Amino acid sequence: MAKHGYSVCINYISNDEAAENVKNQILESGGRCIVVKADVSSAKDVIRLFETVDVELGRASVLVNNAAILMTQCRLEEISAERFSEVLRRNVLSCFLCSKEAVKRMSIKYGGAGGTIVNVSSAAAKSGSPNEYIDYAASKGAVDTLTRGLAVEVAAEGIRVNAVRPGLIYTEMHAAGGEPDRVERLKSRIPLQRGGQASEIAEAILWLATDKSSFVTGGFIDAAGGL
């Protein structure tokens, strides 16, 4: 986003070093960037996050909801109520809270100039992730429904809402599920016969965030290699 002239706010919850590294890369390339440590599943933290952006960067025009957690692989009967609630809180409530604050700033109804919201869902929303992460899949299904409903709700207010559904991507998230090499194990099932890269997902997000997708709202990009 910074390469395309956007001022960027990096939100994070724990990894100070990683956030600062990305910030420094953006600043060194001539971009404008701030970092804000906040738990986006906390209403109080989300309000503080957006108020900080208001003061330091101006009203948000693009929101990318990509906060999510993945827990250890298991069957549904092994998932505790506490785990299920935590996954929904981190993966769905965060999306709701951030979208709520974004709409207040983007909507022409509230004096805004419009904007775009891009939610990062998952191919798991369609597959259900049986025997692995039904809780994660269910949370992403909720993100899909939120995407579609909000897109229609705010379409006449200058806001577009879309989502990207990544498939098997080489990220650190698989380690959280207990299988760092999961993509390697499953890539033969992918029609393109390989796992995806985070940079490929970023390109899909960028397209939805910019005016290049100006006639697209309530839509989904399945970036899953054919799955």
What are these regions (language model features)?
Residues 69, 112, 118-142, 147-156, ...:
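Catalytic loop of short-chain dehydrogenase/reductase
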Residues 190-201:
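A conserved structural motif in NAD(P)-dependent oxidoreductases
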Residues 73, 205-206, 217-227:
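Short C-terminal tail/terminal secondary-structure segment
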Residues 155, 160, 216-218:
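Short, small/polar-rich loop/turn modules that mediate ligand/substrate recognition or access, typified
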Residues 74-76, 80-85, 186:
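Substrate-binding pocket helix/loop in short-chain dehydrogenase/reductase
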Residues 16-17, 37-49, 81, 199:
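The beta1-alpha1 cofactor-binding region of Rossmann-like NAD(H)/NADP(H)-dependent oxidoreductases
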Residues 104, 152-153, 214:
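Alpha-helical segment proximal to the catalytic Tyr-Lys
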